[in-house]
């Protein structure tokens, strides 16, 4: 896992926004929600923005997380989605 300090900074459960930046494609938001659903089932309404040139999309989804390990796992799995450049 990652060596983070989320457990020192957050009181769990906590609302945590994940922003995923990836190559522009219609299914990126669906792929992000599918990964989140596997670990934290719920009803998610991601927001999407295209870059100024339209080459990239950023998808933001707020997730209620229950542990630092859950945050770290989501960072790892979201980064593994095809075409993803960054997870913030």
UniProtKB/Swiss-Prot annotation:
Any one GO CC term of the record: cytosol
Gene3D superfamilies: 3.30.70.260
SUPFAM superfamilies, alphabetized: YbeD/HP0495-like
HAMAP family documented for this protein: UPF0250
The family this protein is said to belong to: Belongs to the UPF0250 family.
Protein name: UPF0250 protein Shew_2940
């Amino acid at each position: 896992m990652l060596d983070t300090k989320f457990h020192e900074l957050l009181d769990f459960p906590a609302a945590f926004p994940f922003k995923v930046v990836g190559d522009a494609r219609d299914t990126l938001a669906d792929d992000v929600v599918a990964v989140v659903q596997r670990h934290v089932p719920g009803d998610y309404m991601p927001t999407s923005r295209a870059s100024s040139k339209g080459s990239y999309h950023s998808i933001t989804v707020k997730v209620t997380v229950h542990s630092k390990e859950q945050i770290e796992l989501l960072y790892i799995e979201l980064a593994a989605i095809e075409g993803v450049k960054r997870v913030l």
